[in-house]
Amino acid sequence: MNIFNNHLHETDKEIDEIIKHEKLRQNSVIELIASENFVSPAVLEAQGSILTNKYAEGYSGKRFYNGCEEVDKAENLAIERVKKLFNCKYANVQSHSGSQANQAVYLALLQPGDTILGMSLDSGGHLTHGAAPNMSGKWFNAVSYSVNKETYLIDYDEIERLADLHKPKLLIAGFSAYPRNIDFARFREIADKVGAYFMADIAHIAGLVATGEHQSPIPYTHAVTSTTHKTLRGPRGGLILSNDEEIGKKINSALFPGLQGGPLMHIIAAKAVAFLENLQPEYKSYIKQVISNAKALASSLQERGYDILTGGTDNHIVLVDLCKDGITGKLAANSLDRAGITCNKNAIPFDETSPFITSGIRLGTPACTTRGFKEKDFVLVGHMVADILDGLKNNEDNGKAEQKVLTEVTKLIKLFPFYTR
């Protein structure tokens, strides 16, 4: 078989069918998973290009392989564009994921056994910020801070107390499920007080930071990490930023050869495309719409009597606390899925249920905002979600409500077609 003569549908019908079905699924549902988004055809084209063939260990101009002239140009473009996007002096675009971006910073700045201080998982933190099952919780002495038990907001005085007590080498700000703004300046004050490095993981809010809709951590941190998907609407991958170019040199060495081998040049090219898209004026309008849509979604659920954690949102995340409703997050997410609405079960602060069950759900607006949804559409979505939750409160077999909402979902999404070719 000459592999160059056949297309996917000729070579592997099974994978071709899977991709077709997934395309149909993405077109057919209301996507509320806060960490997901839809990339442009241009990003897809770069990601699926022949750049996937090129091995390029090292950095631009200092590769261990010949023939890297063109991929060097692609990586240089990605770096210059993202530095402009975030107004910073240093960027590394090679990390394969946000988790590996975090690991590279740890490898650059810490030694095994050093103390790190990050947000606990049940308060909205991320696995890589010191959770016990993660390497960050195994290699380091990981201490966690929580949100306030009454307001569910970050308690900066408590973080300062813990920092004074434990003297961390690294203080981490960032989250996977926290709906309010972060005071990076306050974090830096705490870090300086105890002589710690300060890292911000902005994987969820990178788009908000890039457009000025959230305080930038760049002036206050030693290192900033992010994913390149989520609100940045690029390919799945990671990113590291800093204004400290000496720390940048350490991070470069930590990522390669310390942590990774060859970078994924097709992904880096796709990152460059996404960064160019994000430098356009339309992107700022998009992020503003993401936030407005999240506020509309939260308000519509509150009107239906559901508890929204912290009473609302400043970003793209809406956390629904289902404790008083007697519904688990798992039950709610599965029922919503059958009704054509995808989200994820999510722990709420001080949750006593299993992380596989949870007492809440996490909703997000980036993906459907990309499709073109506005506030009025998210008000409708909020009522659809509430209809499913109402049904679960009264009857664990929620088939009737699911079918009704699925019909409404199908009607709404037909107004917002995408990936049509």
Curated annotation (Swiss-Prot):
Keyword Repressor: no
Protein name as it appears in the record: Serine hydroxymethyltransferase
Pathway the protein acts in: One-carbon metabolism; tetrahydrofolate interconversion; Amino-acid biosynthesis; glycine biosynthesis; glycine from L-serine: step 1/1
Cofactor names: pyridoxal 5'-phosphate
Family note: Belongs to the SHMT family.
Any one GO MF annotation of this record: pyridoxal phosphate binding
Record HAMAP family: SHMT
EC number, as in UniProt: 2.1.2.1
Keyword Amino-acid biosynthesis: yes
Source organism (scientific name): Rickettsia felis (strain ATCC VR-1525 / URRWXCal2)
Modified residues (N6-(pyridoxal phosphate)lysine): K230
Keywords per UniProt: Amino-acid biosynthesis, Cytoplasm, One-carbon metabolism, Pyridoxal phosphate, Transferase
Function of the protein: Catalyzes the reversible interconversion of serine and glycine with tetrahydrofolate (THF) serving as the one-carbon carrier. This reaction serves as the major source of one-carbon groups required for the biosynthesis of purines, thymidylate, methionine, and other important biomolecules. Also exhibits THF-independent aldolase activity toward beta-hydroxyamino acids, producing glycine and aldehydes, via a retro-aldol mechanism.
NCBIfam families to which the protein is assigned, alphabetical: PRK00011.1 (NF000586)
Compartment(s) of residence: Cytoplasm
Site for Plays an important role in substrate specificity, residues: H229
Gene that encodes it: glyA
Any GO CC annotation of this UniProt entry: cytosol
UniProt subunit comment: Homodimer.
Catalytic reactions of this protein: (6R)-5,10-methylene-5,6,7,8-tetrahydrofolate + glycine + H2O = (6S)-5,6,7,8-tetrahydrofolate + L-serine
